[in-house]
Amino acid sequence: MKIHLEYISACALLLSMISCKDTLDTNPSSSFTEEVVWNSYSTADAFINGTYVAVLTGTGLAGSGNCVSWEARTPNGLQFSQVGGEGIDGIATELGVTNATDFGANRFSLLRRCNKIITNATNSNLKDSEKAKLIAEGRFLRGLTFFDQARKMGRFVPLTTVLSISDSAACRTPLTANVDESYKYVIDDLSAAVNGLPASAPSGRASKYAAEVFLSRACLQAYAYTKKAEYLDKAITSAKDVIQNSGISLTSNYGGMFNESDPTNPEILLGYYRVKENSRVENFAELIRVYPNVRLDDMKNSKCYQTYTTGVMLFQAWGMYFPTQDMVDQYLVTDENTGKALPWYETSQFKDNAEEVDVNTVTHAGQVDMYARKDGSRRRIPTPQDLKETKTGYPIFQRYVRCKPSATRNLTDIMYSKRDKRFAATIVYDSCAAWLGFPVTLNLGGNLSQGVREMEDGGWYNTATGYYWRKNTLEKLEPRAFYNVKVDFHYVLARVGEAYMNLAEAELLKGNVSAAVEALNHTRTIHGGLAPSTASTEEQAWKDYIRERRCEMACEGEDIYFSYLRWGKYGGYANYGRTPGDVVYDLDRPVYKIEISRDRRKVLIGQVTVAGSANRNFTQKRYLLPIQQGFLNTREAYGLDHEQNQGW
């Protein structure tokens, strides 16, 4: 009777779960028989192609918004819109995440596809070499699925077989006991993928070296949560193999990797590609929620000296994701006298032409600059909102700068010239190279500026920080940035640049400062065009490394957010001297924006405060996000383990 009841319970659980389309499916969705699919390499390969799409989009690795939304949860980015109550990101403030939030607890349909690849390829009559490759791809895709669950929630149901109604025991598979067990599954699958994948692969499919980038990434995350030194060794071995044996160098065209000019650059080891026949601007938040919406009437009302001249409204999107001044400050500037790479406000060209003013002297709206638009509405620096809803314990205004009377250059030129080369490829800034062929001005009254539309503080589908993202946007759209325009688009998922970053971090964790600095200097000098770091202490090296990763990997998947979780787990120099596992300082503070005067001779940098934006918070429970409570409740109903993560 006990066996009978357990079987009924397992079947009932299966039936309850398959009522949801994306769960424990036990029947193939294809009309082809298993024999037809798996005894022909071409049909098996087609199934794997479909599984790549399912896994990469289903986990969010190549999902719309995966770059910009997770970046908005770090000091690099901001999500903000005053249109229709869209507001700000709820994870950055922790006001919008509860145990009902789903971060991917139920990935059974994805795992079923991966397990079918592994099982059916093993049992097929294909050549051994074909079997090995297909199995390796199945392990790779399953490893990615497990990894996404591990780094977000820490624990998951590790299904490694193709379930059927008769699998009563497998249907009761428990959650992994802890993060340590979870990462064993992740690392085991990715390691198997590395051993079985070919050295090269077509665009959109994983090679051995793509798998090694993911493996090194996963090993760093695993080490942060388990402190097992073996993961550092594997991270180093994997990253070095990519660097030394792939035969692929860092590209000289960093920006081209992320737009239409060089989408299959050799440095890209794995990308996700969509063609315009079935893709439109609206399908990608990196486009539709980044490009602004600005009308010719807005520009004329704001007295812009550069407006649309062709009659075509180039920017007709719904921008709500923007880079911050915190991000921009990471990009160093080459000193014109010494050649050293320095923060913009420490260079000789800055000191010769500008001076800092006490920020405490800024006390009222419009004090720095102000003008009236044609309709009589005012635009001010600072705005009234800039002085309200600030986060205590942090300066309201971080920097107030003005040109010296003798200055022959304006502040836009001083701040943005001779920057790290990745800056111009990543950020749209005042007077930058034309965007969609249109000259951009972001100073007070500028054509795409904060106050160019109805709201003085921006967020009316236009910038709220003084910047826009350029990385991952397209440079040419016909006829404009509009929701239904067809586009070729791609996401970069793994590349050689990350291998250098992962190597540098692992070497730092082992105390090998010189090796870490050598690794980070590759991207810093080749992609950034900067003088190399000369850091010689652990503290200096961590500072330069974190800066380098933020620049190199900005707005690239979820990299920076999960890097911050690692750095918080490490503590010490990786998190401002705090103890391991303490609050992540940079995720617990406000972010800053820039406001540039009309004549570009004054700049004010202050907190982004509108709609509670300054109220960013990080509590330690966020090191592991919640396992969706509804998922756990279903498990509890059938007598299965259902423990929630601490604090949720």
How would you name each of these model-derived features?
Residues 20, 52, 107-108, 185, ...:
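Long, intrinsically disordered, low-complexity segments
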Residues 20-71, 101, 116, 134, ...:
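Acidic, glycine-rich segments characteristic of secretory precursors and extracytoplasmic regions
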Residues 401-523:
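C-terminal substrate/ligand-recognition segments
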Residues 150-157, 201, 221-227, 511:
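Short coil/turn linking the two alpha-helices of tandem helical-hairpin repeats
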